[in-house]
A protein has these predicted regions:
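Membrane-interfacial terminal anchoring regions of lipid-handling membrane enzymes
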Residues: 1-27, 31-39, 56-65, 136, ...
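Catalytic core of membrane glycerolipid acyltransferases/transacylases, capturing the structured
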Residues: 14-15, 19-28, 37-38, 51, ...
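A short, well-structured juxtamembrane/interface segment
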Residues: 43, 47-70
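Short, basic, glycine/proline-bearing loop/turn elements
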Residues: 45, 116-120, 151-152
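Short gly/ser/thr-rich secondary-structure transition/capping motifs
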Residues: 51-59, 126-128, 183-185
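Generic preference for hydrophobic
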Residues: 58, 72, 95-96, 146, ...
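Non-catalytic C-terminal accessory region of glycerolipid acyltransferases
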Residues: 128-236
């Protein structure tokens, strides 16, 4: 909490400008391209991280596909995860976020500007609808982030089981899967300190459709989970 307050304080001048601009970008009639909207948000996020006393170490950026129409599956450690992704991925990302967070100040406008989706984790029909929409949009050339654990891990760098249902969107889109390992992403907001923190984000080699075409969603989920877990163990 102390770091969040510090980040807000360090960006008091810029915050109203960001909120106004991103709110306008979230409107349906906005004329900015998807890349332009994303780049603006990424610049904002990079400043927030820099002035929030966090060093973001990025590895494996060369594994991010140069062509749109892919999905990113990271482990989930907390609120800082999306900041790390927006600050490190040059391709425009949309995200599936829990419904409870979709109404937070600034978050709701960022979601609108990135054309992201909120999902009710207690409503099976809503989950099916969102997963189906993600698959359609990725197939049409958009990029999405889904946290397959369903909720954040409360055990630091340990990761939870990946829910196989989220990978139905992959089967529908027939797209590259980019596993992402987040390391110490829980620390900036969970540790009640303003000491400088180091967060690592590792983009792993993409898993192409040819590799998973004959697999069940449960097998794909386990494969992605294991590759991320192995990368974390190797790096800490």
């Amino acid at each position: 909490m102390r770091r969040i307050i510090y980040m807000v304080f360090m960006n008091l001048f810029w915050a109203p400008i960001w909120m106004f601009t991103i709110h306008r970008m979230g409107r349906e009639e906005d004329t900015h391209t998807r890349q332009e909207r994303y780049d603006y948000i990424a610049r904002m996020v990079k400043r927030i991280i820099r002035y929030g006393r966090v060093n973001l170490v990025i590895k494996g950026q060369e594994h991010i596909p140069s062509e749109d129409g892919f999905m990113i599956f990271p482990n989930h450690q907390g609120l800082f995860d999306m900041l790390a992704l927006f600050a490190s991925c040059p391709r425009p990302l949309s995200v599936v976020i829990k419904k409870e967070a979709s109404g937070w100040i600034l978050v709701k406008d960022v979601l609108a500007a990135t054309r992201s989706l909120s999902m009710d984790r207690e409503d099976i029909k809503d989950q099916v609808r969102i997963i189906s929409e993600v698959g359609k949009r990725v197939k049409s050339g958009e990029n999405f982030v889904i946290f397959a654990e369903g909720h954040r891990s409360r055990k630091g760098n340990e990761i939870l089981e990946f829910k196989s249902g989220t990978f139905k969107s992959v089967m529908k889109a027939n797209c590259p899967i980019v596993p992402v390992a987040l390391i110490n992403s829980f620390r900036p907001f969970d540790i009640n300190s303003l000491e400088r923190e180091n967060v690592e984000i590792h983009y792993l080699p993409p898993i192409m459709p040819e590799e998973y075409k004959n697999m069940k969603t449960s097998q794909i989920a386990q494969m992605v989970h294991d590759r991320i877990e192995e990368e974390i163990r190797r790096s800490i």
